Amino acid sequence: NDYSNVSISVKSKDGNSDINYEFPKDKHHLIPIYGLYADYNNTVVISSEGVDKVINIKTDKLPDDFVYVDSMESGNFRFYNGNYPYAIDSNDEVRWYLNGNYYGDILVLDNSNIVIGSDKYTEDGNTISFYEMNFLGKIYHEYLLPNGYYGVNALYNDNILILSDKLMLIDLQTGELIEEYIKNDDYNYICPIEDDIIVGKDDLYSRVTDG
């Protein structure tokens, strides 16, 4: 039996924020390594069928124009999008970023891919689509929105809510429009709660009833 699974552990500086992920059994593995610190000699443990191999990966520093957003939010792994999309760990250390001028919120899917606005912009500064991609930037799907994508999204019943000129529900598998709700009134927040959807801007919130 030549099938084997592989697990990766990127060791943290403090010993409490390792990044671990696994790959299912297969004959051949092409293993991406993400979760590395910038400008650091990272320790990575690759494990398969009870055998561990330790490697070291030295990384470059962050780009000179990298903008770091200070945040008071808590959590083990938080995503932001400044002039680069990036993620930080519980110690506010950057552990992942993408090259490219992508737009809007970063949403992590159950398959460990992300949803993010594309790097294709209209003259008024809105992007015309959003991507499903992996953490290395490989694009699997592009969803076109003729009236623009405003960078706000949320998962809803295994589909995705997005803000274009209206609040829309889109099938992530097919890209088809499932439903349109209210007109976008400069909203910058979506939060599904059971069968309702909360949209908001600034400190004002509205409830949208599905159906």
Which role fits each region the language model picked out?
Residues Y3-S7, H29-L30, Y34, N41, ...:
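Histidine-/acidic-rich catalytic cores in large beta-rich domains
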Residues I8-S12:
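Conserved aromatic beta-strand anchor motif in extracellular beta-sandwich/beta-rich domains
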Residues D14-E22, V94-W96, Y140:
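Surface-exposed loop/edge segments in extracytoplasmic proteins
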Residues F23-K27:
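Short proline/glycine- and polar residue-rich coil/turn motifs
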